């Protein structure tokens, strides 16, 4: 099925509230506990998960402290722990049921101390200069205006130890309308191939209602502005990307 370009209709100030986003994830724990179903709408989700977990332990082989922002059911933390066990893991999420499921799953893994932080990451009090690895997978697209984005990247930078690594995998948009239109069209065709006729419309509708993604270049510029000395693109395919900043 041919999928045409889909333009966002909902302005940022009319998007889902934090409470509404929390309710959606509270009700969907089982699906997000399974990578095959929870990440069906994400192009190359298994590849990005493997890349980030592999590079996390390669860049920081002696890492002791890990923070997973918007951890969901713990998929990224589990992938990293299985390649480098024994780390202390701090898990942060809006959804208490998600946090409980992540903690439950990590109980079966070789970890150090596991702590959970329930709430909006922007409002959580976390230890500064404490983390060797920070991961944010499919979460930053909920940030809204420029001040929100800049504040969040600055906070993450402050939480990392010198030499620490900040990994992101997420939905991204594009600065040029023509590029965005083509990438969005290709994403729609991918969705139809995965979920059948009409699936792209469902996904596009909740993106329009809930998400405010920014471009990969915008986010990497923010990393530099926050102070990260090295930044690298790990992977990009259509509207999804994985990238890293080193403090």
Question: At which residue positions do the language-model features occur?
Answer:
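A short glycine-rich, Lys/Arg-flanked "PGG" loop and its adjoining helix->strand segment in the class I
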Residues: 150-162
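A short His-aromatic
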Residues: 141-145
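Class I SAM-dependent methyltransferase SAM/SAH-binding core
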Residues: 65-123
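A short acidic, Gly/Pro-enriched loop at the edge of an enzyme's catalytic core
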Residues: 126-134
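A short beta-strand submotif of the Rossmann-like class I SAM-dependent methyltransferase core
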Residues: 136-140, 168
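C-terminal alpha-helical "lid/dimerization" subdomain adjacent to the S-adenosyl-L-methionine
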Residues: 169-226
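Conserved class I S-adenosyl-L-methionine
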Residues: 2-60
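Core SAM-dependent methyltransferase catalytic element
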Residues: 224-247
């Amino acid at each position: 099925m041919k999928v045409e370009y889909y333009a966002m209709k909902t302005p940022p100030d009319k998007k889902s509230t934090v409470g509404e986003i929390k309710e959606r994830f509270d009700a969907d724990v089982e699906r997000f506990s399974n990578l095959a179903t929870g990440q069906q709408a994400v192009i190359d989700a298994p590849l990005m998960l493997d890349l980030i977990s592999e590079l996390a332990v390669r860049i920081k082989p002696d890492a002791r402290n890990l923070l997973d922002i918007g951890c969901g059911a713990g998929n990224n933390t589990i992938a990293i722990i299985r390649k480098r066990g024994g780390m202390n893991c701090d898990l942060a999420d809006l959804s208490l049921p998600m946090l409980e499921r992540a903690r439950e799953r990590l109980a079966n893994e070789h970890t150090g101390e596991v702590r959970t932080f329930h709430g909006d990451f922007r409002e959580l009090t976390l230890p500064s200069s404490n983390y060797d690895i920070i991961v944010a997978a499919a979460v930053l697209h909920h940030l809204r205006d420029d001040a929100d984005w800049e504040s969040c990247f600055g906070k993450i930078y402050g939480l990392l130890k010198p030499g620490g690594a900040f990994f992101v995998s997420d939905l991204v948009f594009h600065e040029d309308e023509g590029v965005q239109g083509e990438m969005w069209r290709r994403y729609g065709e991918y969705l139809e191939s995965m979920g059948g006729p009409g699936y792209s419309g469902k996904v596009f509708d909740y993106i329009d209602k809930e998400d405010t993604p920014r471009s990969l270049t915008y986010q990497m510029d923010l990393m530099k502005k926050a102070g990260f000395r090295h930044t690298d693109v790990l992977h990009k395919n259509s509207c999804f990307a994985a990238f890293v900043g080193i403090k």
